[in-house]
Amino acid sequence: MILFLLYATTTVFLVAGIIYFASKRPGYSHVKQTISELGEDNAPDSRIVNMGLFLPVGLILILIGLLSRNDNIVSGLAICLGVGYFISALFPCDAGSPLFGSGKQTIHNIGGFIEYGGGIYFLHKGSHL
C-alpha cells in the first residue's frame, strides 16, 4: 500500500509539474512537443525542470522498482521509467529534442529508449499474465 501511495504521489507530482512548466512556456504544445523540451538547453526553467522535477521523479521510480522486487513487472517498469527520467535530468536534450544532435542528445535519447522501450516491454509482459 505504501508503494502504491508513493507511486500515485509521484505521478501527481510529475503531471502537475509538466502542466505547470508547460503553462510558463509560451507556445508549448503537449501534442507537438516532448516533455523533454521543458528542460532543454537554454529553456527558461530548465534547471528546475531537470533537477526539481525529472531527477526526483526518476530517483523515486528507481526506488519503487527496487522495493518491488517481488513483482518483476512493476519492478522492471518502474526502474525503466526511473532510469529514463534520471538520464534526461542529467543529460537535457538539445533545443527541439532532435533525433540526432550533440553527444548529450544521444545520451538523452538512449535514456528515452530505456524508458519507452522498457515500458512497452514490461507493459506487454504484464498483459500476458
Give each language-model segment a name.
Residues 1-28, 42-129:
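Hydrophobic, aromatic-enriched alpha-helical segments typical of multi-pass transmembrane helices
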Residues 31-32:
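A detector of repeated loop/turn-to-beta-strand junctions in beta-rich toroidal repeat architectures
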